[in-house]
Amino acid sequence: MRRVLVAGNWKMHKTPSEARVWFAELKRLLPPLQSEAAVLPAFPILPVAKEVLAETQVGYGAQDVSAHKEGAYTGEVSARMLSDLGCRYAIVGHSERRRYHGETDALVAEKAKRLLEEGITPILCVGEPLEVREKGEAVPYTLRQLRGSLEGVEPPGPEALVIAYEPVWAIGTGKNATPEDAEAMHQAIRKALSERYGEAFASRVRILYGGSVNPKNFADLLSMPNVDGGLVGGASLELESFLALLRIAG
């Protein structure tokens, strides 16, 4: 049985002082959870997350990581640093990193390796732009991305890897794939994982949907057998909507 994960990607929003208030309110209002919750804020907020969320059911993590272990790499943040801050997760391969920073599948794979070396679970993002979907090539495009981003990546177990399918055309647009569209892609991803790591492994890897997830569509998405949670953007910034997602997840 795969445990539902609701992971909030805050992107470049909130200051550390704003986050402190948000975390304190979350801590006060958090219902008992059967599912798993995580918040992924900007790097400067992570020490605040460590301080406020340490003894709660809410995990936290980063939105990116360096592909390098350490050294003269100005502006980079290593997996070891994230581990020292208590991060449970880190996103790699988000479409905004691929688009605006030119990140390749090979670079994403190196980042995933660095995280696994430090015991941090990568949330590895894959997904197609609109023009690819309109050509009917969404599945082969996404699976090529998945295979390239997992090249040489050997998680110690299925719980050590999370995949997030994020159709690029649905991110921040208010559009979202239908539950049936999401399920079809998640099935294809799980099949590719089975070919790469074996069926027993693939059956236990969580595959999240990311793309304008909100309290209105989340229950329908979760009703699909291969949708194991959400990588949530805008709806994770408002405490009320994030709590609503957690209540839906159970």
Swiss-Prot record:
Gene3D superfamilies: Aldolase class I (3.20.20.70)
Enzyme Commission number: 5.3.1.1
Described purpose of this protein according to its UniProt entry: Involved in the gluconeogenesis. Catalyzes stereospecifically the conversion of dihydroxyacetone phosphate (DHAP) to D-glyceraldehyde-3-phosphate (G3P).
Chain sites annotated for binding substrate: N9, W10, K11, G172, S212, G233, G234
GO-annotated cellular components: cytosol
Gene: tpiA
UniProtKB keywords: Cytoplasm, Gluconeogenesis, Glycolysis, Isomerase
Pathway this chain belongs to: Carbohydrate biosynthesis; gluconeogenesis; Carbohydrate degradation; glycolysis; D-glyceraldehyde 3-phosphate from glycerone phosphate: step 1/1
Location relative to the cell: Cytoplasm
Reactions performed catalytically: D-glyceraldehyde 3-phosphate = dihydroxyacetone phosphate
Organism the protein comes from: Thermus thermophilus (strain ATCC 27634 / DSM 579 / HB8)
Membrane-spanning segments: none
Protein's name according to its UniProt entry: Triosephosphate isomerase
Pfam families recorded: TIM (PF00121)
A Gene Ontology BP annotation from the UniProt entry: glycolytic process
